[in-house]
């Protein structure tokens, strides 16, 4: 595939939205609005046969009426009209068409499948590449192109190709709450022309993309895709969520994007052999993306854990070991430094994970948590350091705020000088209606925001942190 075709899609000098409506509830209206809201710098041409203006922009009855060339078309017209549109696209020199248009093969109707075949033949005849049909298209913060409301306007390192528009929107919204930012996102639907392999190959060579994530319901050419995936994982991490794993899921896939799901066990084995990371939920994918985007390579299993309280320390030991890490004993030099700060009666309790909550108040207020974290981060005995932020200590509001503020400032300082991977576990709660104004959850959310702004990976639970970071370990051991 000529790479410049997708370069045109992601860096178009002009975009036409065909079927642009004045109905504010329509997707076609939103596509035009997003180009304006997100600051697209190229020319925007709404195509509407009955209106002269849309959102302050001059409209045109057809592509043929546009005086200049058009690079990229977003098609929002009924499927039977698409072949004629492609003829107009050819005349205007359009290189890529995003078919938001649906109701094709995914309907299961014979006539819809025949129309889809005609559309593909027409596109190939004219040398036009298609994204879709039945998809949301492209989100490119660098260019100011978006298919969703309230997506981040600033770019980042994560590139995505998702077969589902709904899943891609959900992922962008929730991952952005964790601080993730995006290079390019493609919702590609039925993959009539450009498919998962094309998008993977493009993102693998894209300098703006450092990590790749994909949600797929089926693959058009398994051998070709796996070959491209193996080549890509040699240079960039790829995280894959395969939907349609069971009987009901397979049925849903067929009606959603007209994909053949295939055997998940075969999928799983093949994907893992390429060096890609296979996840099972969007939440696990977000955790993995946070880890790959912000952690340096994790090259060993020796983990040091500080803080969290007694029960959390015990759970930490279990859950890190169950995930495949080794909660190694504290080295003598760190134990010796801690014994200088606490009375002898506490010496027998100084172990990894280090639970400062059982130590005297003087250890808390002196910042011993941060000092231990710093020593672990500098020690050759650990490959990875985890800060469990204590959210339920035996103290009141003012004391808790002061203590956690101190912890977070210590973490920020250590991160600035870090010599090994550092991550944080901070539970900001699952909020009910009455909790949003509670000082505790508001304060913890502020601390999480501070940490993510510094590109420190933050996880809501120990188990999520351990599983996600183990994905990083697995990837770098293979590559």
Where are the regions that the model predicts?
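Catalytic-core regions of core metabolic enzymes
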Residues: 1-479
């Amino acid at each position: 595939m000529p790479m410049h075709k997708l370069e045109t899609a992601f860096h178009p000098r002009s975009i036409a939205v065909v079927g642009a409506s004045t109905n504010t509830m329509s997707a076609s209206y939103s596509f035009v609005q997003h180009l304006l809201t997100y600051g697209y710098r190229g020319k925007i041409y709404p195509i509407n046969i009955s209106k002269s203006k849309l959102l302050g922009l001059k409209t045109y009855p057809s592509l043929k009426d546009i005086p200049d060339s058009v690079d990229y078309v977003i098609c929002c017209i009924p499927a039977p009209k698409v072949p004629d549109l492609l003829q107009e696209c050819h005349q205007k020199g359009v290189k890529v068409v995003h078919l938001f248009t649906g109701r094709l093969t995914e309907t299961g109707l014979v006539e819809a499948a025949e129309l889809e075949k005609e559309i593909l033949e027409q596109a190939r005849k004219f040398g036009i590449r298609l994204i879709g049909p039945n998809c949301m298209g492209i989100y490119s913060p660098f260019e100011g192109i978006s298919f969703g409301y309230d997506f981040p306007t600033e770019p980042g390192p994560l590139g995505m190709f998702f077969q589902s528009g709904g899943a891609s929107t959900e992922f962008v919204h929730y991952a952005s709450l964790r601080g993730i930012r995006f290079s390019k996102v493609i919702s590609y639907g039925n993959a009539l022309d450009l498919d998962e392999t094309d998008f993977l190959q493009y993102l693998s060579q894209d300098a703006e993309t450092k990590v790749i994530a994909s949600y797929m319901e089926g693959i058009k050419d398994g051998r070709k895709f796996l070959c491209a995936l193996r080549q890509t994982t040699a240079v960039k991490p790829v995280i894959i969520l395969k939907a349609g794993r069971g009987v009901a899921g397979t049925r849903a896939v067929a009606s959603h994007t007209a994909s053949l799901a295939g055997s998940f066990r075969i999928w799983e084995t093949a994907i893992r052999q390429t060096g890609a990371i296979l996840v099972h939920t969007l939440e696990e994918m977000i955790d993995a993306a946070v880890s790959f985007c912000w952690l340096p390579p994790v090259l060993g299993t020796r983990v040091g854990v500080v803080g969290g309280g007694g029960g959390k320390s015990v759970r930490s030991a279990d859950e890190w070991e169950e995930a495949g890490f080794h909660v190694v004993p504290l080295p003598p030099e760190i134990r010796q430094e801690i014994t200088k700060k606490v009375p002898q009666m506490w010496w027998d309790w100084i172990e990894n994970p280090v639970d400062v909550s059982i130590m005297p108040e003087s250890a808390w207020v002196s910042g011993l948590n941060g000092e231990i974290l710093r020593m672990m981060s500098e020690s050759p005995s650990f490959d990875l350091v985890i800060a469990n932020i204590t959210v339920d200590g035996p103290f009141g509001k003012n004391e808790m705020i002061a203590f956690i503020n101190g912890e977070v400032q210590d973490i920020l300082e250590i991160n600035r000088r870090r010599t090994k991977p550092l991550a944080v576990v901070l539970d900001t709660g699952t909020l009910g209606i009455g909790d949003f104004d509670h000082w505790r959850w508001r304060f913890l959310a502020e601390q999480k925001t501070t940490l993510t702004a510094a590109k420190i990976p933050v996880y809501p639970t120990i188990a999520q942190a351990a599983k996600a970071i183990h994905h990083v370990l697995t990837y770098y051991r293979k590559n």
